[in-house]
Amino acid sequence: MKKPQDSSFAVQRRSGHIESTRYWKLSPAEPMGADCAPYPQSTADREAIEEAAALLREGSTVAFPTETVYGLGADARSTAAVEAVFAAKGRPSDNPLIVHIAERSELDGLVTEVHPSAAALIDAFWPGPLTVVLPVLPGVLSPLVTAGLDTVGVRMPDHPLALALIRAAGCPVAAPSANRSGRPSPTLAAHVLEDLAGYIGGVLDGGAAGVGLESTVVQVQPDGTAAVLRPGGITAEQLAAVLGPGAVTSAPAPAVDVAAGAPGPSTDLAEAPAAASGYSPGAAHAAGDNSPAPRAPGMKYTHYAPRGALGVVRGASAQRVAEAAADLLQAAQRAGEITGLLLFEEHRALYPANAAACVVSLGSLASPEEGARSLYAALRRFDEAGATYILAEACPDTGLGLAIMNRLMKAAGGTVVDAG
């Protein structure tokens, strides 16, 4: 019998607790919505899933692919297991976790009620990239999962491998993104290993995540309206198509720090980009430590950030944005910075050929799905290039563009360059 491909990905001990992180390479599996076929199909894949599920049952942590990003899973009922997730990520304990289930019937054992509007959204978008915040059933989940709140975010992923793992584990799986806190979320198993090898029990490699951004998080109010706490793979327009016009509201946008009123070498971002270039896990935790626990992940802290300083450039036209960004990048290069530019393909010709040391495209503005799918990998590309000063073009904040801009603004810590 063919053994599952298990290289027992040996790494130097870094956490003091896990000397090696197990690694399984599985057959690719595509999301298929409600008609998702059973998985795994091969004996090798089935054995790998069972071994990973056994780790979860034993209280260990396993990274696995979903249609959004790779998640770091643990038994949501076990405080010790959930503590291991927080420790591996360096995640602040007041940041709640999303619970993943494989069957809708499992909701009955986790929450006290499901509002009819929430049920309508679940019917429309599960399995899929939608997390619904619901009143938690006391005493079932570890209190660390909910960060002491009386609600819990639950979703059913649209990925055969993820569903197979949850079913095999036989428990609700708490799973934030499988990266160090504050870093870009992982869309490949290689990203997980880059951040967490030696900190976690295992990684199931199922190929690239399809959506590329985390799930949309919504909370239905008593009047039936839905508040979007975090934009994601399901757009506000899609939610409104189910609940009706005017029934969807958004949480407040991240605070904005306008770094450049008029673009040029004299701006703060150009003068001292290195001030924010060093990544520190604690830096993402510093802001807002005394504020209440967020109702959903991604609401309180800096997230998704590359190691270099990042600013988002916006303006009245693509030409103005390109001119402002080019001026700032040239000034940064003269100051000795390694520069990066994140742009959309339609605007590439507006920049000089040597606009930055590392230029990465998010594809076409006409295909926001492509931009969403490649955003986190693009931010990691800048790290690979050693970029210390990065500028990213803004995009329209409609449809999926709202989620892209949410992630960019979080990654930039709210720093905006206003090109006028």
Residue ranges and their predicted role:
Residues 2-420:
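Active-site-adjacent structural elements in enzyme catalytic cores
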